[in-house]
């Protein structure tokens, strides 16, 4: 019996030195690639000063970045350009969840968009457009609450098949 256990143990030990080779899994991309705003949440806090946990250097320049995402594949092989425009009609008859507060387009005097396009570089899946806030933004107390949004809309795309759309 002890001999059998020794042989089984020896066989197990020898088998452990033989291994299968693991190669990288390669999957094909989905049938089409899309772009979309990945996070549509009405509150973005701008934190001025130093933060030991997060890089808030953009905040300290009185800026934020509105991000777009690319999906439908494992690797973005193209430079993707998304055309955008501010569309205040997106806010019509829209209220913040759990309140009677209407979603109000931010006055255009409160900010400047760096461009009317969002670029997602080849090899990346996220890109953004910077928003520079003016002194008027910081002077308005309503900016401290869920009140204003920048109703940015994707209007066209080059380098991807379509803009992913849904209902609010």
Predicted regions and their residues:
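Sec-dependent signal peptide recognition
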Residues: 3-10
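Short Pro-Gly-centered flexible turn/kink motifs
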Residues: 120-132
